[in-house]
Amino acid sequence: MPSVYTTDRFERWFGSLRDLSAKRRIQARIDRVEDGHFGDCKPIREKVFEMRIQHGPGYRIYFTLHGSELVILLAGGDKSTQIADIEMAIREARQLEDKK
């Protein structure tokens, strides 16, 4: 079962959500990831994946994997900010790689 860690960027995004129903759904999705069930996900590029949450404006969580035991949540957003969020997540993933 993978361990899930978050970046400060992800924590700020998640903390800023006002829709409590969305927060519950997103947290439930993260809990399922910890059980090894990723659900609706697709690879983006450079080891960054997009997890889609079908609620409200179409929430997205961007993450990377380190082996099979570690998931790092890089950033979040919704369909309206998807392009910028992907670029931000890729930058976060690169910074993590550089710190290795």
Predicted segments with their positions:
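A residue-level signal for beta-strand positions that form part of recognition/binding surfaces
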Residues: 1-3, 48
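Enriched for short, Lys/Arg-rich terminal
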Residues: 3-4, 12, 20-23, 38, ...
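Helix-centric, low-specificity signal for extended rod-like, repetitive segments
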Residues: 16-18, 22, 45, 53
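A short, surface-exposed loop/turn module that caps and links secondary-structure elements
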Residues: 28-55
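PIN/NYN-family metal-dependent endoribonuclease catalytic core
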Residues: 7
